[in-house]
């Protein structure tokens, strides 16, 4: 009886080992199939018939061979000239106000008066006639506008007289200032002497009051 039980145990253990071995094989084959299914296989051959054909490359010098050589515009010159003339007419003249106006200087003629001359009894000479020809002295009036400048005769005596008059006026003013300064100094000296006299008088009065007391 014990021998039969031992044999049954051996058979069961052998079956268990076989089943476990088969189970391991089945698991390994399933895992290998999953890994092989995840991988993507790429084709190793290339079909050149599917590649589009490229056009032949042309040289850049042959690009303008078919282009027109000349372009003719009819009526363009006249329109451009008319448009330019209209633009010139519409453009304002910015320098119109800057052009100077030239005016001639006015001349004032002063007649020289002649002294009265008494004639001799024979009547050869008499009073000077007002209608007689006199020597005219031109006087030029300087205009503020731009104009022609005539020659002007300079009178040296007149300049000297004006300088003498100006020097005399300056001398008179200087003398007057000196006189005013001396007058103020004398007035200050007089006031100072009056104050000194009043002070001495008060001092004497105070002394006399002390003696009487």
Swiss-Prot record:
Q: Which residues lie on this side of the membrane: Cytoplasmic?
A: 28-213
SS bond partners: none
Membrane-topology descriptor: Single-pass type III membrane protein
Coiled-coil ranges per UniProt: 168-209
Tell me the GO BP annotations in alphabetical order.
Answer: adaptive immune memory response involving T cells and B cells; apoptotic process; T cell mediated cytotoxicity
Membrane-crossing ranges are: 7-27
Which segments show compositional bias classed as Basic and acidic residues?
179-206
Q: List the subcellular locations.
A: Golgi apparatus membrane
Residue ranges that the UniProt entry lists as topological domain Extracellular = 1-6
Name one cellular component (GO) term.
secretory granule
> What keywords would UniProt list here?
Apoptosis, Coiled coil, Golgi apparatus, Membrane, Phosphoprotein, Signal-anchor, Transmembrane, Transmembrane helix
Outline the segment boundaries, as ranges, of region: Disordered. 179-213
Modified positions (Phosphotyrosine) are: 94
Modification Phosphoserine occurs at: 36
Q: Which residues carry this modification: Phosphothreonine?
A: 41
Q: Record keywords: Phosphoprotein included?
A: yes
| Protein task | May participate in suppression of cell proliferation and induces apoptotic cell death through activation of interleukin-1-beta converting enzyme (ICE)-like proteases.
Its domain description in UniProt is: The coiled coil domain is necessary for the homodimerization.
Q: How does it assemble?
A: Homodimer.
Record protein name field: Receptor-binding cancer antigen expressed on SiSo cells
């Amino acid at each position: 009886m014990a021998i039969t039980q031992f044999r049954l145990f051996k058979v069961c253990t052998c079956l268990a080992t076989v089943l476990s071995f088969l189970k391991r094989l089945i698991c390994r084959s399933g895992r290998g199939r999953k890994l092989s299914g995840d991988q993507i296989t790429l084709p190793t051959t290339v079909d050149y018939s599917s590649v589009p054909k490229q056009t032949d490359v042309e040289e850049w010098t042959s690009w303008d061979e078919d282009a027109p050589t000349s372009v003719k515009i009819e009526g363009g010159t006249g329109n451009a000239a008319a448009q330019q003339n209209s633009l010139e007419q519409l453009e304002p003249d910015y320098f119109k106000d800057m052009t100077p106006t030239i005016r001639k200087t006015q001349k004032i003629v002063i007649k020289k008066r002649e002294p009265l001359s008494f004639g001799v009894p024979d009547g050869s000479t008499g009073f000077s006639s007002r209608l007689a020809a006199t020597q005219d002295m031109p006087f030029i009036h300087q205009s503020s506008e731009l104009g022609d400048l005539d020659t002007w005769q300079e009178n040296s005596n007149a300049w000297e007289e004006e300088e003498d008059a100006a020097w005399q006026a300056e001398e008179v003013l200087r003398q007057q200032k000196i006189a005013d300064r001396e007058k103020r100094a004398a007035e200050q000296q007089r006031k100072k002497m009056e104050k000194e006299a009043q002070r001495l008088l008060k001092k004497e009065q105070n002394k006399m009051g002390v003696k009487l007391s």
